[in-house]
């Protein structure tokens, strides 16, 4: 269940009724206006959900970039101290980092 933002509540509780009060004097417009408002409200909710998923994907990409940089620094530390670490072990470590982040981001 997604919560609405205070701005959307203000928009639908204050601005829309003031804007549409001239149309509400006609009784045959009431049903269509309620349907139209509910459609726009659902569209707003959908757009908010899409925006949240885009933000989540962006943050996931940024975390993955940071992990790649840290993993490369980790690899250089192994090289600097002459620790035997082959590419397969490095890939396994990076896979562990990647799966840890992907589980936490969902």
From Swiss-Prot:
GO terms for cellular component: membrane. Keywords: Membrane, Transmembrane, Transmembrane helix. The keyword Cell cycle does not apply. Residues 28-32, 95-106 are extracellular. The chain crosses the membrane at residues 7-27, 33-53, 74-94. Residues 1-6, 54-73 are cytoplasmic. It is found in: Membrane. It comes from the Eukaryota. Its main location: membrane. This is Putative uncharacterized membrane protein YAR047C. It comes from Saccharomyces cerevisiae (strain ATCC 204508 / S288c) (Baker's yeast).
